[in-house]
């Protein structure tokens, strides 16, 4: 999968000594009301790539987007200043913040500077060629270490990579591409995918793409309700998309023709209303009443999925199978999560809700790989080319 140049290979070969290295990281972190960083995972994840370049004797420039500022009109709230401070603490050295950096940056070997929010530059979002060429002129080596933005063709993720003398993947991006390639391009069978979420329409292209590849396609959440409708089961007043039933049937049909399966729930957990205090009732799937809402899979279905997952060679997990935020509707997602943790197969998980479930059940160490990309992870599952990766592949060819 990763037929790209890598920062680790360049560092090992001694090619970075005295060179100017430009790293596009993903430092788009959340802030609390007082303007303090509330969660710094992405900043910590960027440190190995920065250290690698510093230890190899490079002069290092790092940039990232933060939020969605107006190009050419950054405000104080859009500034990477708090990120520079946190990065200084993590690296144990001063990290200067450089504003207005497109026309030139002074940085010495062994030093690292943070270039102010790249989305402040006019032309960033449009992947402007003039801006891309100017940024490429700042460096000897361009590094993309931001998988989370790999599905976007912007000046710092795509354009600069076309014109920099050398363009490569940082360690974070390299690990992500290796894990995704292992899961989808050369998977150990059986390959099981779990796709949860509220709407078939938003995940339809993923479901269609996976229907050609996987041995078991487990659907969860509102998506499962639409598949239950397609299988002729009652769903009461559950969240579903009746207009997507034909598409759901087509996915089931593709799987069936390949000797593969979409396991439809045989029992479910229902409530009369949606909320933290709603009373939960387990019912056979055929017995759902008109005023019922399906909010989780039942214990029998959960056990069946656990058995499938325990014997899987590869697992791709995107989305919970129930409303796991409420404990009475969390059993299905917990059983699935623990089965993934116990499976001997290679697992890759991605998407915000999935990461929240992994954190809730404390299984991060037992998950093969946790993807840092939301939209990029989904587009990869769809089989789409990611512009930021495609340009690195083209430069390595």
UniProtKB/Swiss-Prot annotation:
GO terms for molecular function: ADP binding; ATP binding; phosphoglycerate kinase activity. GO terms for cellular component: cytosol. It comes from Bordetella pertussis (strain Tohama I / ATCC BAA-589 / NCTC 13251). Monomer. Belongs to the phosphoglycerate kinase family. SUPFAM superfamilies: Phosphoglycerate kinase. The keyword rRNA-binding does not apply. Pfam families: PGK. Pathway: Carbohydrate degradation; glycolysis; pyruvate from D-glyceraldehyde 3-phosphate: step 2/5. ATP binds at residues 203, 325, 351-354. This is Phosphoglycerate kinase.
